[in-house]
Design a protein with these regions (language model features):
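Mid-to-C-terminal secondary-structure elements
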Residues: 117-129, 143-283, 481-538
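N-terminal membrane-entry
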Residues: 276-295, 377-378, 382
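Membrane-proximal extracellular/periplasmic loop immediately following the first transmembrane helix
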Residues: 37-99, 209-221, 234-236, 257-268, ...
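Hydrophobic alpha-helical membrane-associated segments
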Residues: 28-35, 292-298, 345-353, 389-394, ...
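Alpha-helical transmembrane segments of integral membrane proteins
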Residues: 1-20, 274-277, 307-344, 356-476
Length: 538
């Protein structure tokens, strides 16, 4: 093998122009493929680190007419836990309002915080640095923090049992410290406080009664027992809403079903329209994977065409090798060695291109990759597979063609390419131009669509409009006073409040025309609450 590589190196060095063109083409193809491999591997790895990942499901509220929600009525999870033996664990989660900020050295700091039931860490697997996952959320005013939060407020000291003050007067006992939440998790938080804290803050008010069927503001995850037949369970729980609260829902012209969404589907295949965590689309994964395949094919076809175009230059070499006793298999191995060596050299050049391209790629894909990301075992393994595939695709056909020359034909100068070979090369060239044209056309189409969206009338004047998130205003603050204070500024012409951004729904619901209660008259609606100045302000 070493001898093959030495001869391959000499041949590549001898034909420098050919080598540089192929090297650059393969390097560009491999760099694109490695970047997309990094992206696809990362996308498909989300939520895979949980020990019980295959048994974790998220509850969905299914609207038969569309607009499924990942938030549920409060009693649903309790009923599932108590009445369905297939369900091993149930957990409630809910976003903590921004007003519940950390008070530290006279300043307020807002963090991404959630309420969670005491079984949260029995369902999800997060690495504990301090504390016991089984009891960390079992009492009111317990809080679990990430390593970054601990370092920010306490440095390197042990913090288990220490007090963290929120909203000026609420004292929380630190019951656990966990590693920072991995990027490969759809659940992202910095602090997690017990759900019993929420019950204390609402004076022990229970939403598990009749009123809870109208409160769709809690997210639930369930852990199923091993061996559970999920389709059968879904069929059993589908009608839970209508069975338990049908009268009320019919009166409100609503119809909901209970659905289950596997943890593995939440990020890429979610059926929810109001997701709170990072979400993407499996279609984007397929799209970029297709681009990687096409770019690699272009590089390989370019290599094949250039190599076979030089067949006349290598024919004498092949003839002489056969005269001195080399077999066709040996000659094929020599040409495959050249393809392998060129691919490996292209990989090193491609690695430089990848390093230089990472900032742009991160900006384009909304990621935060660095060189260390390329050292993941899956990326290394995938890259080795890519090298093998490129070597086979680009080297095998030229090796077969070139090793097929007969010494007698070479000595006589009869080195004619068969009609089949000519047809194949022409087909490869046509395919190469077709793929290139398709990618260019797709690029211009996307640019055209983006320009079209940017130029469309939004229905309001977005210039000189500033949006402030006033959910951070303490609960006892006067919004009227705040509005008046802003209005007094000389640079402010008009002020308005709403519960959502322009163009985004604040709420979703179903409405019916008066005196026509019934599903056939229901209208799915997205709506928002605004004040009397809203239209004039926009």
């Amino acid at each position: 093998i070493l001898n093959y590589l030495k001869i391959a190196y000499r041949n590549l060095k001898r034909f420098k122009g050919y080598t540089y063109i192929n090297l650059l083409g393969l390097a560009l193809g491999l760099s694109v493929a490695v970047l997309i491999l990094l992206f696809v591997t990362d996308e498909l790895a989300l939520d895979k680190f949980h020990k019980n990942k295959d048994r974790i499901y998220r509850l969905l509220t299914i609207n038969p007419t569309g607009g499924n929600m990942e938030t549920n009525a409060w009693p649903v999870a309790t009923i599932l836990k108590n009445e369905y033996p297939e369900v091993e664990q149930v957990v409630y989660t809910r976003k903590v309002p921004p007003s519940l900020m950390v008070c530290y050295e006279g300043k307020d700091y807002e963090h991404n915080t959630y309420y969670a039931g005491e079984d949260f860490f029995q369902i999800f697997t997060f690495n504990f640095l301090e504390g016991n996952p089984e009891t960390a959320l079992s009492k009111p005013y317990q809080i679990v923090i990430t390593r970054d939060i601990k370092d920010k407020y306490f440095g390197s000291e042990v913090v288990l049992g220490k007090i963290l003050t929120l909203r000026d007067t609420l004292e929380f006992e630190i019951s656990g410290v966990i590693d920072n939440i991995p990027d490969r998790s759809h659940i992202q938080f910095e602090m997690l406080t017990s759900f019993k804290t929420y019950e204390q803050l609402t004076d022990g008010f229970s939403y598990n009664g009749e009123v809870g069927w109208g409160m769709f503001n809690v997210r639930n995850y369930i852990l199923l027992n091993e061996g559970t037949n999920v389709p059968q369970l879904e069929a059993k729980i589908k009608g839970l809403y209508m069975d338990r609260a049908g009268d009320w829902l019919n009166e409100m012209c609503m119809e909901f079903h209970v659905g289950l969404e596997p943890l593995s589907d939440i990020y890429l295949r979610s059926k929810s329209s109001n997701g709170f965590g990072p979400q993407a689309s499996i279609s984007r994964v397929y799209l970029v994977s297709g681009i990687a395949i096409f770019v690699l094919l272009l590089a390989c076809i370019n290599f094949i065409n250039l190599t076979t175009a030089r067949s006349a230059y290598r024919a004498k070499e092949v003839g002489l090798r056969k005269i001195v006793g080399s077999s066709r298999r040996t000659i094929m191995a020599q040409f495959m060695s050249e393809a392998l060596l060129l691919t490996i050299l292209a990989l090193f050049l491609g690695a430089i291109i990848v390093d230089l391209s990472l900032p742009f790629f991160n900006s384009l894909m909304g990621k935060n990759y660095d060189v260390g990301s390329l050292l993941d075992i899956k990326i290394i393994g995938g890259t080795i597979v890519l090298v093998a595939i490129v070597t086979l695709l680009s080297g095998y056909y030229p090796a077969v063609v070139l090793s097929g020359y007969q010494p007698v034909d070479v000595l006589k100068g009869n080195m004619h390419t068969s009609a089949k070979g000519v047809t194949l090369r022409r087909a490869l060239v046509v395919f190469q131009f077709f793929i290139s044209g398709t990618l260019v056309l797709a690029t211009f189409t996307v640019i055209s669509q983006l320009n079209f969206m940017r130029s469309q009338n939004l229905g309001f004047d977005k210039d000189q409009v500033l949006i402030l998130d006033v959910t951070r205003v303490p609960n006892n603050a006067s919004y009227d006073a705040f509005q008046n204070a802003i209005s007094q500024l000389s640079t402010v012409e008009s002020v308005s409040f709403s519960n959502a951004l322009p163009g985004r729904p604040g709420w979703q619901g179903q409405w019916a025309y008066p005196d026509t209660i019934g599903a056939e008259f229901q209208v799915d609606t997205e709506y928002m609450a605004v004040d009397e100045h809203y239209i004039a302000t926009l």
